[in-house]
A protein has these predicted regions:
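Active-site glycine-rich loop that binds ribose-phosphate moieties when present
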Residues: 43-48, 54-55, 67, 72-74, ...
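NAD(P)-binding Rossmann-fold cofactor-contacting core
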Residues: 79-109
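Rossmann-like adenosine-cofactor binding region
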Residues: 111-181
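Glycine-rich adenosine-cofactor-binding loop
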Residues: 36-38, 57-81
Length: 181
C-alpha cells in the first residue's frame, strides 16, 4: 500500500490540492524538481463531467471525511462549486482534520462549506433539497456489507439530484439502487 502522506515530505513542491489534503499519489519530475499531486479529487470531478454533468457553481452534499472524501471536497471547492455540505460523525477520527481543511478552503476559495452531523437525517433531507449532487465518500455499502446504506432507507431523493458513490464493489450499491427507484 503506498504511503501518500510520507510522499509529501519527499517532494520539492506540492500542488494546492496535495498541500491541503496532505497526501500525494502522483509525482512529476520537472527538471529535477519533484512536484507532488493528489489526483483522487481530480479523477472524481472528471468522472462527473465525463458523465455529462456540470456541477460547477452548484451545491454538493458529501457524505464522509476520510481520505477519498477529503480529496473530493478539496477538488470540488478548488474547481468552483458554490456550496458543499459535508456530513460526518462528530466522533469521527477525521473530524478535526476536516475542520482544518474547511478553514483552509474557506480562505482560498469562494465555496461555502458546512460541516453537518451525519446522524441528522432531517438536515440531510434539507441539504439535499437544493443540492445538484449527493456523493457518498464513505465505505458504507461496500462488499461484504452490501446491505448497508449511508442514508436512511425511507429517504426520498429530489427529482433532479445526481447521486454518486465512490464504492467500486458492488458496482451498484444500495444507495444507487435507491436513487434509481
Amino acid at each position: 500500500m503506498p504511503d501518500k502522506n510520507l510522499m509529501v515530505s519527499l517532494c520539492d513542491e506540492l500542488s494546492t490540492a496535495a498541500r491541503i489534503i496532505g497526501a500525494v499519489n502522483t509525482v512529476v519530475n520537472e527538471d529535477g524538481r519533484l512536484i507532488g499531486h493528489n489526483t483522487d479529487g481530480i479523477g472524481y470531478m472528471q468522472s462527473v463531467k465525463d458523465a455529462g454533468y456540470d456541477i460547477i457553481g452548484k451545491k454538493m452534499t458529501l457524505l464522509g471525511a476520510g481520505g477519498a472524501a477529503t480529496a473530493i471536497l478539496v477538488q470540488a471547492a478548488l474547481d468552483g462549486l458554490k456550496e458543499i455540505s459535508v456530513f460526518v460523525r462528530p466522533t469521527s477520527r477525521f473530524y478535526d482534520r476536516l475542520v482544518h481543511t474547511v478553514d483552509e478552503l474557506t480562505e482560498i476559495t469562494d465555496c461555502r462549506i458546512r460541516i453537518c452531523d451525519f446522524s441528522d437525517s432531517n438536515l440531510l433531507k434539507k441539504e439535499l433539497a437544493d443540492s445538484a449532487i449527493l456523493t457518498n465518500g464513505t465505505s458504507v455499502g461496500m462488499a461484504p456489507h452490501e446491505d448497508t446504506c449511508p442514508v436512511p432507507e425511507n429517504l426520498t431523493f429530489p427529482k433532479d439530484l445526481i447521486v454518486s458513490d465512490i464504492i467500486y464493489n458492488p458496482r451498484e450499491t444500495k444507495l444507487l439502487t435507491m436513487a434509481k427507484n
